[in-house]
Amino acid sequence: MDLLHKAKLAPLLPGVYIFYGKNKEYIYVGKAKRLRNRLLSYFNRSNGKYSKKIQAIVNEAEELDYIVVSNEREALLLEANLIFNHKPKYNVMLKDAEFYPYIEITKELFPAVQIVRIRSTGGEYFGPYTDVKFVKDLIDCLQQVYQFRTCRRDMSKSTKPCMEFYMHRCAAPCTGDLEPDSYINSSIQPLRRVLNGDISETLDLIEEKMKKHAKMMDFENAAKYRDLLVKFENVMQRQGVVLEQWRNLDVIGRFKNSYAVLRIRGGHVVGKLSYELDSTKLEDFIFHYYMVGKNELPEAVILERNINFDAEIYFGRPRDKLEEELLHKARENAKNQAYTSGLRKDLLNKMVKVLNLNRYPMKIEGFDVSHLHGKLTVASVVVFFDGLPRKNEYRHYRFNSDRIDDFLTLKELVKRRYSKHELPDMIFVDGGTGQINAVVEALMEIGKECDVVGLAKQNEIVCTRFGELILPFDSPILRTLVRIRDEAHRFANSFHRKLRRKSALSSILDEIPGIGPKRKKKLIEAFGSVKNIRSATLQEIAEVLGSRKLAAEILSRL
């Protein structure tokens, strides 16, 4: 039975519908007040809401099914559960949610603190945050005060402490000398209080340590805590203090199907988040943000109108002038998000026409190859989704050959990646016709097809399978391609530099008697580079090696 015929047989009742791709894979889940009407709209090209996304869903779908429910609320719940469990590729519910970092406290006997973008079911999460630099700086400050671990070591075995312990950044529960309750009370609980908005205890503690060292005439450590106090205050001020009273709020602004959330904890704005939803209903967004997204609920959620969710938490209009001002800010953020999202969609639509693409380039993957005279060859893959970088999907690839042949490296990269991964809508390569042909040939060898676009380094000439294009220097399409190329280049080079540092360190260590493979591995893991070893103390190196004599020999040679 074809899809259109099945749509015609659907009842005029509320329910959830599912489009399946190959191998019964979920590609889109939606809900409808009247299933038949909604499904038929997918096959009506004259429908004003017919879009590139709908066209892509219908073209890719191999099967259609639906589930009838009693009412719209039941449909909303079922839709949310199916999306959460199956993550269909064309569902953009709470699009951009994976871009935002969270702080995770792991559920372990000795919890670790991590910065993550994708949440599992095992941890305790704080966030999301918009500014990853803020998160890194915050963790850096707090680790110096509370000495929690950030590593992924197996805590079931006692081991020697790493460099973090000697730098007074970790209490080293890995040694087996700490009780779990002691570690949690001294390192994790104070961190939780800061992440919930209470920073006064931390400020007092840093100031107390600074004064204590100054009184003992230990001016070096007093200066260290003075600098830490200034840094911590600056980090928190970057987020902005907006309320004099202690209040934990989420303020949600809406413009069309764009939403903005201001997260306020303890009087600080700790997040300014932007999302898009297929629906323009405020209730749908709230449900997806808190129930499906599993984001923490504050004391109150400020909205443009009152909503009854049968919950103890207040969901409704501003209760004072300050909350009115915050709601206005959230609306302005949502409006700006809608505007920039519209610009991105226009740009991607123009790319289809100008570059002669077969598909709307919702997902673009960019390649770059880096090597040093054929040695240490690496490749990077960067991912752009809806015109924005999706950094949690970036990947590095290493190659063992010593050849200087970017074409063969590209071919190997394509085969390795797309033998296992799904193709994007467009592949971008740093190079011209030769690089494009290498990618196309590799795809053919594994029985796949995809639009491939390149950018020649000289004169920024755009290359496609149809030939070369010279776009104006200020063309948004050219600027987008340059941005993808530069990002792929940056990502490949950063990884290459890291490998070169490790290679240089490994070569130097090979020349020192008494440094075998095991000790060499320990030094590389602990310090990472020659520069870091040079700046380490004799005691720090000796602790890693278990030998002061060897540590002294290393320092003398460096």
From Swiss-Prot:
Annotated keywords: Cytoplasm, DNA damage, DNA excision, DNA repair, Excision nuclease, SOS response
Any Gene Ontology biological process: nucleotide-excision repair
Main location class: cytoplasm
GIY-YIG domain residues: 12-92
NCBIfam families: uvrC
Similarity annotation: Belongs to the UvrC family.
UniProt protein name: UvrABC system protein C
Organism: Pseudothermotoga lettingae (strain ATCC BAA-301 / DSM 14385 / NBRC 107922 / TMO)
Higher taxonomy: Bacteria, Thermotogati, Thermotogota, Thermotogae, Thermotogales
Gene (name only): uvrC
